[in-house]
């Protein structure tokens, strides 16, 4: 078993995200993304891609969402996206927001 440092990797990345996936686990079955959206940052794209599904959880702070779903995503709430469904996140708050994406393959998808 391994422990993965995701928060600091996300904070120090150019995009504000860290993808914990095949490179770290050796498995194509699932992945997780830890994302940090800075105060007033907007237009962060979230899109699973063909053959993938994702559940997005607003972990810290509220997010304003546009795209496939438009409206607020309150802290502690989640949404589900499939394939080419795309959303854009905006953090209208005064402090950083954090979201977690749990992703995996759709039933018929294979790598």
Describe each PLM feature range.
Residues 33-50:
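Conserved short histidine dyad/triad with adjacent acidic residue
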Residues 51-64:
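Glycine- and acidic-residue-biased ligand/ion/polar-headgroup-sensing regions
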Residues 84-85, 90:
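Short, surface-exposed secondary-structure boundary micro-motifs
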Residues 1-31, 44-45, 110-111:
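A short, N-terminal "cap"/entry segment at the start of jelly-roll beta-barrel domains
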Residues 68-84:
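Short acidic-glycine-tyrosine-enriched beta hairpin
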Residues 31, 52, 67-68, 75:
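Short, solvent-exposed loop/turn positions at domain surfaces
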Residues 80, 94-111:
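A short hydrophobic beta-strand segment most commonly corresponding to one strand
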């Amino acid at each position: 078993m391994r422990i993965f440092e995701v928060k600091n990797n996300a904070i120090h990345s150019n995009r504000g995200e860290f993808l914990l996936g095949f490179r770290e686990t050796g498995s194509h079955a699932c992945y997780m993304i830890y994302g940090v959206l800075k105060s007033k940052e907007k237009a962060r794209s979230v899109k699973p891609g063909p053959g993938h599904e994702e559940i997005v959880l607003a972990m810290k702070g509220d997010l304003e969402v546009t795209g496939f779903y438009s409206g607020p995503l309150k802290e502690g709430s989640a949404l589900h996206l499939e394939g080419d469904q795309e959303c854009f996140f905006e953090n209208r708050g005064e402090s950083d927001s954090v979201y977690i994406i749990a992703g995996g393959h759709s039933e018929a998808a294979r790598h």
